[in-house]
Amino acid sequence: MNRNTPKARGASSLAMAVAMGLAVLTTAPATANDQLVELAKDPANWVMTGRDYNAQNYSEMTDINKENVKQLRPAWSFSTGVLHGHEGTPLVVGDRMFIHTPFPNTTFALDLNEPGKILWQNKPKQNPTARTVACCDVVNRGLAYWPGDDQVKPLIFRTQLDGHIVAMDAETGETRWIMENSDIKVGSTLTIAPYVIKDLVLVGSSGAELGVRGYVTAYDVKSGEMRWRAFATGPDEELLLAEDFNAPNPHYGQKNLGLETWEGDAWKIGGGTNWGWYAYDPEVDLFYYGSGNPAPWNETMRPGDNKWTMAIWGREATTGEAKFAYQKTPHDEWDYAGVNVMMLSEQEDKQGQMRKLLTHPDRNGIVYTLDRTNGDLISADKMDDTVNWVKEVQLDTGLPVRDPEFGTRMDHKARDICPSAMGYHNQGHDSYDPERKVFMLGINHICMDWEPFMLPYRAGQFFVGATLTMYPGPKATAERAGAGQIKAYDAISGEMKWEKMERFSVWGGTMATAGGLTFYVTLDGFIKARDSDTGDLLWKFKLPSGVIGHPMTYKHDGRQYVAIMYGVGGWPGVGLVFDLADPTAGLGSVGAFKRLQEFTQMGGGVMVFSLDGESPYSDPNVGEYAPGEPT
C-alpha cells in the first residue's frame, strides 16, 4: 500500500550493512531481532531510541573525550523545513541517517557520504484536524528501524499525529503499509517513537488530556496486522493481565482493579495513555513502559486509585501479557504522567546481590528503581529536596506518603506545589554511565499553583478541569530560581554525585560516553558537554533554535560525530510557538517560560559536530556538480 510519494534520489550502503549483519550471523541466531541487537552493539550505529534495548543513551566511543572536546566544531547541518518542537533523535544505520519531523511528520533519509544529501523523503498527507486535538504542540518523538529478513527488506517505522503508523522501505522510502492506531475524533493522536521487538512494532497512544483511554498495540512488522492490544484501564482481559500478574508483589494489587478503583464507567474516559520511551530485556522477554495520568486532571471527578494509570509495566513482547505493574502515584492529582524513560542496568544492590534493574525518573519528582524481573521496588528517592507533594515513598508498600497541604481538592487552592504538572522530569531521554554507575538526569525545576474546576466530558475536546500557574521554583529560594538542573544520580546509594543549575528546563535529556562526557541540551538553544565525574562545563555551542531533542553520536569513515535535533516547542515552548501571553495558557507553561523568547526562536533541523569540524566536506570536491548529472 502506498499512500505517499517518496522521492528516491540515490542508493546507499544500507543494504550492504544489513547483508554484512546477516553474514556475521550465519552461524549464530539469525532472526531479525538478533540482527538488530548486533547492529546496536556497533557503537558506530544508533539504531533505536536509547541506542540499544537497555535504553542507556550511552556510547562506548572515546574518540571525543575530556581532553579534546573543546575542539568540537560544526561539521554539517540539515534543515527539516518544519517549525514547532523537534523531539527525539535521528537514527544512523550504516551510511544513512534517518530523520523525523513534527507535523506533517516528514521522514528523510540522508547520505552520510555526502552529508545532508536527501536520498529520499516521505511526506504524508494527514487530516489537519489532528493539530487541533494535540495536547502540547504537534511533536513526534522518533523513528524505529527493522533490519529485514530473507522475505522483507529493512523497514523504517513512524507514527503520525493523525493516529496512523506507517512502515517504509528503508532503501527507497516507499510506503509498505499504513494502519490507523488512534481515532482523532475522540482526541487520540500519536506522538510516540515506535519500538521494534522481534517481528513486532509497538506503539502507544496520546490524548489523556482529552479523556482518551490509553493502550499499547503490537503490529506485525511485515503486514501491519494487529497482534495484540493492551489497555491501562478496564477489565482484566482487556489489560492482558497474566495469571500470575504481580504474584511476587501482591500488595501492588492484582485482579479486577482496572474497574474496581474507578467510580462507574469513569475508566472508559480515564486516560493512562503512554507516549514516552520503552526498554526491553531479551533475556526475560519483557518490555517496559509507563502509563500516564488519569483524566480529568480534577481529582474530585474520579474517586479511587484509578488503576492502572501512572504505572510502570513489565509485559511479554510476544503475547502482550503483563507480568507486573507498579502504580507510582495512585489517584494522581497533579498530572504527573508516568511515561518517562526506563533505563536498564545490572548492579549490585545494598546487600551486594547482583540485580537486573530498571531505573525511572518520574514526573512526580521521584526516581524509582525496580528489579525488572519481577517488579520489586528497590529504591525511591527524591530528585530534589524541594519535592513537597510527598514526604516519602514506603519501600515495603510502594505507597507515597502525601502532604495534604499540596493536594488539589476542590475546596483548596494549592500553592507552591513542587514539582509542577510538567514534573521535575518529563519527556527527555536520560542516560546511564555503566563505568561510573550513575544516571545523568535532566531536570525541570518548576513549581505551581493549582485551582480545579468541574467540567463535562465531550469527545474530542479537552478534559482537564484545572487552571495552573507555573514558575521556576521554589520561589522562596533565589539562588535556586533557575528552571532546570543537570544531575548525576547513584540509584544504589541514592546520592546525587553532582548537580548544576540551568536557566531553563533541561527538557531534551542527556547522553553519556566512555570518553567521560555527558552531553545535554537546553531550551535556550545550547548543546553542552560536562565532565561526567565532576560536572565541570567543558564545551558548549549555541544552536539556531532551542532544543527539546536529545543528543546522539555515531561514527562514519572512522570519525566520531555528535548530532542533535534542534527546534524549540513542545509543552515548554507553546507560548513562543503559538504567541501566547496569558501566563495560565498552554496548561500553565506560558508563565513558566515567559523569558524564553528573549533567548531563542523557532526553526528545526539537525546539527552535527566533529573534532575540528572535519567531515566528508573537508575534501572540497565532495558533493560538487558532476557534468552530465540530471538537473
From Swiss-Prot:
Signal peptide positions on this chain: 1-32
Family matches, as Gene3D superfamilies: Quinoprotein alcohol dehydrogenase-like superfamily (2.140.10.10)
Cofactor annotation comment: Binds 1 PQQ group per subunit. PQQ is inserted between disulfide Cys-135-Cys-136 and the indole ring of Trp-275.
Transmembrane spans: none
Disulfide bonds: 135-136, 418-447
Catalytic site positions: 335
Enzyme class: oxidoreductase
Cellular component, GO annotation: membrane; outer membrane-bounded periplasmic space
Main location: periplasm
Keyword annotations of the record: Calcium, Disulfide bond, Metal-binding, Methanol utilization, Oxidoreductase, Periplasm, PQQ, Signal
Protein name (record): Methanol dehydrogenase [cytochrome c] subunit 1
Species this chain originates from: Paracoccus denitrificans
